């Protein structure tokens, strides 16, 4: 077998269906849009969530809550992810970004207590959950809020 003899598997490549190219093609004239009506027109069709005039779901349900414009979103790191560092290492935001555990620092880094930590680490972050702080200190490490 040579490179120029390679062919895709039978049925793996489907040819694009060109509509509106003569009645002999089977998809000419109305091009699969049927006769007249909103969907046959240029730019026709209904918006997402439109229910044909029936009161739509998003209007039937009550309004609730608000969006806090001052909301802070923290980048999250769990305890089990911190096990990759050597025993006695100092884990900083720069180190977390460098290793790829955090791709975007956002408003800061918060350490959560999911998983187990079996290394003695000094962890510097903006926030710690109570369970994460307890687990780090139980492993012999220290936490520092920056």
From Swiss-Prot:
<keyword id="KW-0689">Ribosomal protein</keyword>
<comment type="similarity">
    <text>Belongs to the universal ribosomal protein uL15 family.</text>
</comment>
<dbReference type="GO" id="GO:0006412">
    <property type="term" value="P:translation"/>
</dbReference>
<feature type="compositionally biased region" description="Gly residues">
    <location>
        <begin position="42"/>
        <end position="52"/>
    </location>
</feature>
<feature type="compositionally biased region" description="Basic and acidic residues">
    <location>
        <begin position="1"/>
        <end position="13"/>
    </location>
</feature>
<dbReference type="InterPro" id="IPR001196">
    <property type="entry name" value="Ribosomal_uL15_CS"/>
</dbReference>
<dbReference type="InterPro" id="IPR036227">
    <property type="entry name" value="Ribosomal_uL15/eL18_sf"/>
</dbReference>
<keyword id="KW-0694">RNA-binding</keyword>
<comment type="subunit">
    <text>Part of the 50S ribosomal subunit.</text>
</comment>
<dbReference type="InterPro" id="IPR030878">
    <property type="entry name" value="Ribosomal_uL15"/>
</dbReference>
<dbReference type="Pfam" id="PF00828">
    <property type="entry name" value="Ribosomal_L27A"/>
</dbReference>
<dbReference type="InterPro" id="IPR005749">
    <property type="entry name" value="Ribosomal_uL15_bac-type"/>
</dbReference>
<feature type="compositionally biased region" description="Gly residues">
    <location>
        <begin position="21"/>
        <end position="31"/>
    </location>
</feature>
<keyword id="KW-0699">rRNA-binding</keyword>
<dbReference type="GO" id="GO:0022625">
    <property type="term" value="C:cytosolic large ribosomal subunit"/>
</dbReference>
<dbReference type="GO" id="GO:0019843">
    <property type="term" value="F:rRNA binding"/>
</dbReference>
<protein>
    <recommendedName>
        <fullName>Large ribosomal subunit protein uL15</fullName>
    </recommendedName>
</protein>
<feature type="region of interest" description="Disordered">
    <location>
        <begin position="1"/>
        <end position="60"/>
    </location>
</feature>
<comment type="function">
    <text>Binds to the 23S rRNA.</text>
</comment>
<dbReference type="InterPro" id="IPR021131">
    <property type="entry name" value="Ribosomal_uL15/eL18"/>
</dbReference>
<keyword id="KW-0687">Ribonucleoprotein</keyword>
<dbReference type="GO" id="GO:0003735">
    <property type="term" value="F:structural constituent of ribosome"/>
</dbReference>
């Amino acid at each position: 077998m040579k490179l120029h003899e390679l062919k895709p598997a039978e049925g793996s490549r489907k040819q694009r269906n060109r509509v509106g190219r003569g009645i002999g093609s089977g998809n000419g004239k109305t091009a699969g849009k049927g006769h007249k009506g909103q969907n046959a027109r240029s730019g026709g069709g209904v918006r997402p969530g439109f229910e044909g005039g029936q009161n739509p779901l998003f209007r039937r349900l009550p309004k609730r809550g608000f969006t806090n414009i001052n909301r802070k979103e923290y980048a999250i790191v769990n305890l089990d992810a911190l096990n990759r560092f050597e025993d006695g290492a100092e884990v900083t935001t720069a180190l977390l970004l460098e290793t790829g555990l955090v791709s975007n620092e956002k408003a800061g880094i918060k350490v959560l207590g999911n998983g187990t930590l079996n290394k003695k680490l000094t962890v510097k972050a903006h926030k710690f959950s109570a369970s994460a702080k307890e687990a780090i200190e139980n492993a012999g490490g220290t936490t520092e809020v920056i």
